[in-house]
A protein has these predicted regions:
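Rossmann-like NAD(P)H-binding beta-loop-alpha module
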Residues: 135-139, 145-153, 159
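Glycine-rich phosphate-binding loop plus the immediately following alpha-helix
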Residues: 164-178
């Protein structure tokens, strides 16, 4: 059986966390995080075989962060080229009632994430920036959104409606997600 490599991303407003896995053995090959994207004191840390390596350089945006991350994967011999990556998974804060489980990212999914940004304004912009940067870097690789709100989607309605006016649920989508 051939090993395939999958990248997992957790984009933040000024950060990008990532890990590369080899499948099917579920082995983590490298993980890291980039902090203070857009600031002059931007830095990133990689963890390879238990050793932490820190770098510093200004990165203007999430696209530069993704480009830097991909270069680090190649420089550290975790991939020979980006063609080895077979899929990308993104942690997304809020899928509302649209997504009870993980989905392949397409234009409609992006539209829904943008729409739900009003509920998680600190997280979705960075998560969307990560998706868009990966689309540019790995345009032919499938991307999957994994929503925090999927976890309790199977709760009965009487368990996820808050004790607030029902109109808030109907009008604003206010409900318990876990």
């Amino acid at each position: 059986m051939t090993n395939e490599k999958y990248l997992v991303i957790n984009g933040g407003s000024s950060s990008l966390k990532f890990a590369l896995y080899s499948m099917p053995e579920e082995k983590e090959l490298i993980n890291g995080y980039i902090e203070k994207i857009g600031a002059p004191d931007c830095f990133w840390t990689l963890k390879i075989n238990g050793e932490k390596i820190k770098h510093e350089a200004p990165l203007k945006n999430h696209l530069e962060a993704v480009e830097t991350k991909m270069k680090e994967l190649i420089d550290n011999k975790k991939i020979e080229s980006t063609a080895e990556i077979k899929g990308v998974g993104h942690r997304i804060g809020h899928g509302g009632e649209y997504y009870p489980s993980s989905v392949l990212i397409d234009d409609e999914v992006i539209k829904h994430i943008e729409e739900l940004t009003k509920l998680v304004p600190l997280h979705h912009p960075g998560q969307l920036a990560g998706i868009r940067a990966m689309e540019q870097e790995l345009s032919n690789v499938p991307q999957v959104a994994v929503f925090d709100t999927s976890f309790h989607q199977t709760l009965p309605k009487e368990n996820y409606i808050y004790a607030v006016p029902y109109e808030w649920y109907e009008k604003y989508g206010v409900r318990w997600y876990g």
